[in-house]
Amino acid sequence: FARPSIAASVLAFMPSFQIHRSNRLERLVVALGDLLADGVGGPLTPEAVVVQGRGMEIWLGGELAKRFGVWATRMEYPRGLVDRLVREVLGDAALGDAPLSEDLLGWTVQAVLPELLAKPEFAALARYVERDEHGVRAFELAGRIATVFDQYLTYRPDWIRRWEAGDLSDLPVDDQWQGLLWQRVAEQVKRPHLAVAVDQLIERLGEGKPLPGLPPRVLAFGLSTLPPLYVRALAALSRHVDVHVFSFSPAPGLWPPK
């Protein structure tokens, strides 16, 4: 089992960010349980335990119930935690009552796409839906585009920011329809989205001022992957509260030096 460790270059910027690595999930559960047993903020203070998905949530809840006899703490997924941090630090207005969701993106793409198909940049899409008598292809295409746009908001927010600023220079000619379509979608919905809100969150956390509403600490368990946007948010959060990441590393070569 590798003891909590982090490179000195990272430690200088993230004094409360600790990574726990092991090639055995069971050992990571023991380390997590030891931290939970210590408690922070009193027995009624809710812990912020973050997992990748429903499967890990069920398994980890069962393991912790074996240790403590009962386990009733609600676990969160990464996007849910980031969304909550945005609302706590920046206020509900940062995301609005109905933030930009994948479903809303899908309906908006379907609504604005027909008016864009005459443009030369959309020639390939126009050919795809030209014999779509019942609108099935257009509906499915809008859904697939919405899924990709939603992933861009999480994994490539830099693209979204450039497109919204009118800069499509990063796109090949055949892909420029994506930037043009996003500009039209953003103009149509006029709602805040997570990429911009997280940038504002990171900036606010980086100011170093005390902030109300933050969790006493964050315990992230078994995350196999995490978007860079969320990593930056956790790094900024670690300036205020302890952030522990319990990482499953099957190969000893991936562990840090002792």
Where does each model-flagged region fall?
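Small/polar loops that bind or transfer phosphate-bearing groups
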Residues: 20, 52, 222
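Conserved P-loop NTPase "ATPase switch" module shared by AAA+ and STAND
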Residues: 214-226
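Short, Lys/Arg-enriched N-terminal segments with co-localized hydrophobic residues
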Residues: 1-13
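Short active-site oxyanion
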Residues: 45-48
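N- or domain-start disorder-to-order transition segments that initiate the globular core
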Residues: 13-36
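Domain-scale recognition of functional cores that engage charged ligands
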Residues: 27, 227-231
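Basic/charged alpha-beta structural segments of nucleotide/phosphate-handling enzymes
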Residues: 51-212, 228, 235, 241-242, ...
